[in-house]
Swiss-Prot record:
Compartment(s) where it occurs, according to its Swiss-Prot or TrEMBL record: Plastid, Chloroplast
One Pfam family per UniProt: Ribosomal_S18
The keyword DNA-binding belongs to this UniProt entry's keyword annotation: no
This protein's UniProt keywords: Chloroplast, Plastid, Ribonucleoprotein, Ribosomal protein, RNA-binding, rRNA-binding
MF annotations from Gene Ontology: small ribosomal subunit rRNA binding; structural constituent of ribosome
Lineage: Eukaryota, Viridiplantae, Streptophyta, Embryophyta, Tracheophyta
Keyword Chloroplast: yes
Protein name (record): Small ribosomal subunit protein bS18c
Alphabetical list of InterPro entries matching this protein: Ribosomal_bS18, Ribosomal_bS18_CS, Ribosomal_bS18_sf
Organism: Pisum sativum (Garden pea)
Family: Belongs to the bacterial ribosomal protein bS18 family.
Record GO biological process: translation
């Protein structure tokens, strides 16, 4: 067969579908900083919808929540690397740790 008569065959590319960053139970709110940090770059910019793989409505709500958190100074407008690392550790969802109380020894009266 001539090259000119060959049919064009598309290469089979694997379609990656990553799990969405927003779960069904997550509230998009300016107070939910652990969620908002997922959508901010290291420089402090809001990541695009293509990068986040969010719907238009979710992206709009995330953008509004990030802007509200910045105005209320919960998030900085420009991130420094040290702030991002400290804040992410601080606001990560932590597993509840069961703590036992140690009994307080009372002093005896004389």
């Amino acid at each position: 067969m001539d090259k000119s008569k060959r049919l064009f065959v598309k290469s089979k590319q694997s379609i990656r579908r990553s799990s969405p960053l927003i779960q069904s139970g997550d509230r998009i709110d300016y107070k939910n900083l652990s969620l908002l940090f997922k959508f901010i770059s290291r420089q402090g910019k809001i990541l695009s919808r293509r990068v986040n793989k969010l719907t238009l409505k979710q992206q709009r709500l995330i953008t509004i929540a990030i802007k509200q958190a910045r105005i209320l100074s919960l998030l900085p407008f420009v991130n420094s690397s040290s702030f991002v690392n400290n804040a992410k550790k601080k606001y990560e969802k932590r597993k509840s740790i069961t703590r036992t109380r140690t009994p307080v020894l009372k002093k005896k009266k004389k």
